[in-house]
């Protein structure tokens, strides 16, 4: 029984560590992907196009879970949206 609990705990830890990053996906201009006035499921589809595991509308922008490390994610510290 102890081994089963240890095994399950290890699997959960691996999922947390390997789960990927999360955040607001950035478009080619560095802006968040908007979900203002979009259909239900839009953000989940957009996130999956960027190889994320899932996503939802955190109004007014999409938020993704399980993004690959190479995915571009919006960051307030390096925000270039609307700047020249």
Swiss-Prot record:
Keywords: Amidation, Disulfide bond, Secreted, Signal. Expressed by the venom gland. Residues 82-84 form a propeptide. GO terms for cellular component: extracellular region. It is found in: Secreted. Its main location: secreted. CDD domains: neurotoxins_LC_scorpion (cd23106). The keyword Secreted applies. Residues 21-82 form the LCN-type CS-alpha/beta domain. SMART domains: Knot1. Residues 1-19 form the signal peptide. GO terms for biological process: defense response. InterPro entries: LCN-type_CS_alpha_beta_dom, Scorpion_toxin-like, Scorpion_toxin-like_sf, Scorpion_toxinL, Scorpion_toxinL/defensin. GO terms for molecular function: sodium channel inhibitor activity; toxin activity. Gene3D superfamilies: Knottin, scorpion toxin-like. Disulfide bonds join 31-81, 35-57, 43-62, 47-64. The modification Cysteine amide is found at residue 81. Has the structural arrangement of an alpha-helix connected to antiparallel beta-sheets by disulfide bonds (CS-alpha/beta). This protein is not toxic. It induces an immune response similar to that induced by whole venom. Thus, polyclonal antibodies raised against this protein can neutralize the effects of the venom. Belongs to the long (4 C-C) scorpion toxin superfamily. Sodium channel inhibitor family. Alpha subfamily. This is Toxin-like TcoNTxP1.
């Amino acid at each position: 029984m102890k081994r089963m609990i240890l095994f399950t705990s290890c699997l959960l830890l691996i999922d947390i560590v390997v789960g990927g990053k999360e955040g607001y996906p950035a478009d080619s201009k560095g802006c968040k992907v908007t979900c203002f006035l979009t259909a239900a499921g839009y953000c989940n589809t957009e996130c999956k196009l960027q190889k994320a595991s899932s996503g939802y509308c955190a109004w007014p922008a999409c938020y993704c879970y399980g993004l690959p490390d190479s995915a571009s994610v919006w960051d307030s510290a390096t925000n270039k949206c609307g700047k020249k």
